UniProtKB/Swiss-Prot annotation:
Chief location bin: membrane
GO annotation, biological process: auxin-activated signaling pathway; basipetal auxin transport; phototropism; protein phosphorylation
Summary of the knockout phenotype: No visible phenotype under normal growth conditions, but the quadruple d6pk, d6pkl1, d6pkl2 and d6pkl3 mutants are deficient in lateral root formation and mildly agravitropic, have fused or single cotyledons and narrow and twisted leaves, form few axillary shoots, are almost infertile and impaired in phototropic hypocotyl bending when exposed to lateral white light.
Name of the protein described by the UniProt record: Serine/threonine-protein kinase D6PKL1
């Protein structure tokens, strides 16, 4: 599992992720130059002793070349200096609209204005939050401020020897493109002679895997699960609009912010491709929806977002005062006379990849069978994700990794007798966990189709950020976080990486 930006340490029983990779054809390898901060690394980037090193193995599979065109939304950068910003055509520099009200952006900009560049010497590392396959994440404080960040530190030498420089570059370039309330903010990135660092948003609530373990029965209520998956769905919709296939959705990668809302993390396995957003009339969309689901997908049957009505929660059915049958009939007749609004569909359906990447319990059948895959793998993992939140386990887990893979391909979906969940929840999971991707819910219309499913009835998509989260994390006591003593940086990073195992299954 890749590194976390949250506060909790990494449990030993977390699921295993796989991807042994070869360079993808459309990317250039990253060259690294020596910079003036090289002499400061040993004294600045030091690690405190920690017991959070991961003992479970991340299983890596053979990754073949991807056959999709790369999006020009974010072009790969061949420069490698200590610059905090790089080239990203959509959102670069100060063009991200949500920077304005963030005090952390102001603090970062103040340091840049004063010193010209931002580097390791401007941060105080407080403690290690977790470690992953390509780096270690630390809680860091910007000197002279009360601004805290999650800093991901990657040993470039170790990445090069393990042929993972491309993954680190891919993650950085994707993070530079993102500007969404449920996706991470990359405040800065810089490099030293030995290390590549990403300065990101810190999520004190840990991840959904850890939070689920604390729930009664180690599972979420259906209402809580609906809250989390709705926010994840909006994040996935945004990623697909940018031509980014996530490929690593699981509770461990969904972090909880201080306000209880969530944030997706870890994009080193993501695939970038071309996408062509299309505006389609709802009448066409509804007819397609009826073919793929037993539910009515007519716009009149689907609750549309509204910024006018303000329910106390965005995740509860709305109740209206009773009206006479005559009034209801007149309303229906009026509604039938109004043409439904067109809908935006931005699903990268043409993307194809032969990469064998992901976590065993979340791998889609088409990945395991080596048939090539596209954006539909994200909707398969979405179904596994919802299943795990509701039932406390994944549906195809076997006695071992090989058995799990065989179950994904050959075993039918089964629901446990307990806990009892709604028919709509089961139907959504069943529609997503279809082994043939072309018959899977959201295969053509993506999140647009998902939002219309009855499981999300009562969700006001325009006001999701106004909803009350199921749980608010306890405030973090930053004062009690011990400062890191001097230690050998390279030794600590190599120590973390030695905890990862690589296996070949095929």
């Amino acid at each position: 599992m890749a590194s976390k930006y949250g506060s909790g340490v990494l449990p030993e029983n977390k699921k295993e992720k796989g991807d042994k990779e070869t360079p993808e054809t459309s990317y250039s390898s990253q060259s690294v130059s020596v910079n003036t901060l090289a002499d400061q690394v040993s004294s600045t980037l030091s690690f405190a002793p920690s017991s959070d090193s991961k003992t479970g193995g991340e299983v890596k599979f053979n990754e073949k070349s991807d056959q999709s065109g790369k999006s020009n939304t974010c072009r790969p950068s061949t420069s490698s200096d200590i610059s905090d910003e790089s080239t990203c055509s959509s959102f670069s520099g100060n063009n991200k609209p949500h920077k304005a009200n963030d005090v952390r952006w102001e603090a970062i900009q103040a340091v840049r204005t004063k010193h010209g560049v931002l580097g390791l010497n401007h941060f105080r590392l407080l403690k290690r939050l977790g470690c992953g396959d390509i780096g270690t994440v630390h809680l860091a404080e910007l000197h002279g401020t009360r601004c805290f960040f999650a800093m991901k530190v990657m040993d470039k030498g170790a990445l090069a020897s393990r042929k993972k420089l491309l993954r680190a570059q891919t993650e950085r370039e994707i993070l530079q493109c993102l500007d969404h309330p449920f996706l991470p903010t990359l405040y800065s990135h810089f490099e030293t002679e030995k290390f590549s660092c990403l300065v990101m948003e810190f999520c004190p609530g840990g991840d959904l895997h850890t939070l689920r373990q604390r729930q009664p029965g180690k599972r979420f209520s259906e209402q809580a699960a609906k809250f989390y998956v709705a926010e994840v769905l909006l994040a996935m919709e945004y990623l697909h609009m940018l031509g980014i296939i996530y490929r690593d959705l699981k509770p461990e990668n969904v972090l909880v912010r201080d306000d209880g809302h969530v944030m997706l993390s870890d994009f080193d396995l993501s695939l970038r491709c071309t996408v062509s957003p299309t505006v389609v009339r709802s009448t066409v969309l509804a007819s397609e929806g009826q073919k793929n689901s037993g539910y009515c997908a007519q716009p009149a049957c689907i609750q549309q977002p509204s910024c006018i009505s303000a329910p106390t929660t965005c995740f509860s059915p709305r109740y209206f005062s009773s009206k006479s049958k005559k009034d209801k009939k007149m309303k229906n007749e009026t509604g039938n006379q109004v043409s439904p609004l067109p809908e935006l569909v931005a699903e990268p359906t043409s993307a194809r990849s032969m990469s064998f990447v992901g976590t065993h319990e979340y791998l889609a059948p088409e990945i395991i069978k080596g048939e090539g895959h596209g954006s539909a793998v994200d909707w398969w993992t979405f179904g596994i994700f919802l299943y795990e939140l509701l039932f406390g386990k994944t549906p195809f887990k076997g006695s071992g990794n090989r058995a799990t893979l065989f179950n994904v391909v050959g075993q039918p979906l089964r629901f446990p007798e307990s806990p009892v969940v709604s028919f709509a929840a089961r139907d959504l999971i069943r529609s997503l966990l279809v082994k043939e991707p072309q018959h899977r819910l959201a295969y053509k219309r993506g999140a647009t189709e998902m939002k219309q499913h009855p499981f999300f009835e009562g969700v006001n998509w325009a006001l999701v950020r106004c909803a009350s989260p199921p749980e608010i994390p306890k405030p973090v006591d930053y004062e009690s976080a011990p400062a890191t003593p001097a230690a050998a940086t390279s030794t600590s990073v190599k120590s973390d990486q030695s905890n990862y195992l690589e296996f070949d299954f095929f």
